[in-house]
C-alpha cells in the first residue's frame, strides 16, 4: 500500500553496452555486421532445409528449429541495441520492455532444450542407428519440438508474471543493453524475493537438465567414436563433435555465469559481457558450426546453385 502514492515508472532508459561516445559508432558497425551475418546465416539455413528434400530428416528438422530460435531472439535484442547506439536518449516503454523480456526468455529457454534434443538425436543416430527411424519418428520429433517451445513460453510467462508484480518507482535507468531480469530487479522498490527464488530455480532446471542430457549424449557418442577403426574417421568425428560441444559450452557457460548466482553478487559490467555471447555471438556462429563440416549441407548448396545456373 505504501507504493500506491508514489509515481510508477512508465518508461525505462537503457544505458547500453557503454557510455563512451567514441565507441558508439564502432560498436554500431560491429553489431550491425554480426546481426546481418546472423540473419543471413540462420535464414539461409532454414530456406536451404525447406528447399532440399534430402534434408527433410529429424536432424535437420531440429537444426531448422534452432536457426529459427536464434533468428528470433537475436532480432528481439539487436535491432533495438543498434538504434540505441545512434540515439541520444535510449527510451523503451514499460509495455515494450515487458514484451521484450517475455519473448527473449521464451526463446532462450527454448534454445537450451533444443540443443539437448539435438544432442539426443545425434546419440540415437550414432549409438543406435538400427532403431533410429523408430525412435526419432516424425511424430516423436514433432512432440519434442512442441515440448521445447512449450517449456520456453511457459517459463517466460512465469518470469514475466513475477516481474509484472514488481513495483518500479523513481529509478528507471536499466544498466544493460536490453530488458533482462537482473537489471530490472535492481530498479525495484518492492520486494524481489519471489523473483529471485523463481529465477534461480528455473535457471537451474533450464541449464542443468539440458547440460546433463548433452554431456550424457556426448559421452556415449565419444565411446562409439573410439570404436571406429579408421584414424581418419575418428579424427573427422572428433573434430565435428568438438566444434558442436564448443558452441554449446559457450552458450551454457555464459548463461550459467549470468543467472546461476545470487542477485546480491551479480556483476553488472561482467553481466553485459556475458550476455553478448548468448545474445549475439552464439546465434551468429551456430549456422557455421553446424554446417561447415556437414557434407549434406554442402551437397544441398551445390544442387541449389546448379539449379540456378541451369535456369539462367
UniProtKB/Swiss-Prot annotation:
SS bond partners: 97-189
Q: Which GO terms describe its cellular component?
A: membrane; plasma membrane
Tell me which Gene3D superfamilies the record gives. Rhodopsin 7-helix transmembrane proteins
Q: Which residues cross the membrane?
A: 29-49, 57-77, 100-120, 144-164, 205-225, 245-265, 275-292
Q: What is its main location?
A: membrane
What are the protein's UniProt keywords? Cell membrane, Disulfide bond, G-protein coupled receptor, Glycoprotein, Membrane, Olfaction, Receptor, Sensory transduction, Transducer, Transmembrane, Transmembrane helix
Recorded GO molecular functions are: G protein-coupled receptor activity; olfactory receptor activity
User: Ranges in the Cytoplasmic compartment?
Assistant: 50-56, 121-143, 226-244, 293-312
Extracellular topological domain ranges are: 1-28, 78-99, 165-204, 266-274
Please indicate which superkingdom the organism of origin belongs to.
Eukaryota
Carbohydrate attachment sites?
5
Residues in the signal sequence: none
Question: What membrane topology term does the record carry?
Answer: Multi-pass membrane protein
Per the UniProt entry, what is one GO biological process?
G protein-coupled receptor signaling pathway
Report the locations given in the UniProt record.
Answer: Cell membrane
- What role does this protein play? Odorant receptor.
Q: Which family does it belong to?
A: Belongs to the G-protein coupled receptor 1 family.
According to UniProt, the name of this protein is Olfactory receptor 8G50
